[in-house]
């Protein structure tokens, strides 16, 4: 099945941005909803005030008292990059503020599942926990919080996931997505919420003379912004103005060589130059290697990497993560072949694919089903949930959606209409996780397909490449590419600029197995440009009969043997 991919241009928008900005940047920012210069602020003074976060006063009080009483604090994280950075940041910050009894615990994806479950509480109790602080989880952990209380353990929940109808009975709860939280940004990642709590705690301790009385140097929390940037980008949260400040500051520290040894080691194994780092490198190079620990092994390896102060140890741990990531890629490649075979079987049985795909194979790896769902969604442009066996007749699924279908809302509707179909579920608009009994998979697959069929129509399943318009030939330069690189950070909901244009196709050849290397020239005349399109359909390309193409592309800086040149990163190409 070939999904039709259309080229559409972002609408132009009014702006109050000053003429001192280059016209191209004014246009690009306006197309992304930026109206005033203050929305482009990158300094820390532009951050939203931590006092606007609901529940932060209570959380600070619980933490301050725990530090004063020298209670044992256990940070309970999550097994993804956001959870790992949140955990490491909170441990480092609390220790720097005088916490002598600060430990951490990351649930094992395969043995414990997600969140603060009673099983995880038992592990925290075994560590002697007197206070549990959740990071990047906890907003739906009713049973875990209740179990902690039965054991005499207090709980502070910090999370950013969407809450359910009822909330756990924690001593304090911070989540910008709570209905009564007035914090203007709802886009903080888990590591962003943790950073805000640590800022508030430091301010409180400063005011009460904590550091002076104990002869402690007041910690510079800006030193942790490399972790904030990595976790925020890797979790693919919207890059609103507040998140762009956090990421810009973190990137600046990394570029200046002021990052933690663990991040430096991740840069080395992924062959990234710290001085030239951009936000997408965090998402596509560092994030996957950190995530590999939680997908295939235990995220404690990732947290230890972020915590360690010794570059030699960091390099060893980063090498382990790099090997895990390579294994993940191999597992994913095999699963993708099987998934495409399942899609072909579905097409043969009913002419067209369902608008919503639920897929299961008994040999799939539950740590990789989320990536698989993402790949299949990209290929067929429809909501996809992939399931893997989790033992004891239970399946765990991970879903990815497209614009127009809020995946968590869809699962909530299924749960309302068919109670008991799912054992549990949670997530966001574009991604969700769930579990169900294996015997009910076929029923779930049909009901999910029916629901998506009601909520979407076929026109919404067409792939769309959004363009910011054409670049004139004089703009197709290294200078423009470098300006765009520095104009970010770009990312989710603040996309890196994509342009379109018609070109004469002068050269085309495959590099690797599926990458198309080209040389093109604008039809109206202009510079000769190198370009590359990754993972092309090799049944279609290269095609020596094609002389002219329409391209959707990003203008990129290519570095080779110390020489910098402009290059087109081709998102899609259409023969003319």
UniProtKB/Swiss-Prot annotation:
Annotated S-S bridges: none
SUPFAM superfamilies noted in UniProt: DHH phosphoesterases
InterPro entries on file: DDH_dom, DHH_sf, DHHA1_dom, RecJ, RecJ_OB, SSDNA_exonuclease_RecJ
Coiled coil location: none
Keyword Nucleus: no
Enzyme class: hydrolase
Residue spans crossing the bilayer: none
Gene Ontology MF: a single term: nucleic acid binding
One Pfam family recorded for the sequence: DHH
Keyword line: Exonuclease, Hydrolase, Nuclease
Similarity comment: family membership: Belongs to the RecJ family.
Function (record text): Single-stranded-DNA-specific exonuclease. Required for many types of recombinational events, although the stringency of the requirement for RecJ appears to vary with the type of recombinational event monitored and the other recombination gene products which are available.
PANTHER family noted in UniProt: SINGLE-STRANDED-DNA-SPECIFIC EXONUCLEASE RECJ
Protein name: Single-stranded-DNA-specific exonuclease RecJ
Organism: Dickeya dadantii (strain 3937) (Erwinia chrysanthemi (strain 3937))
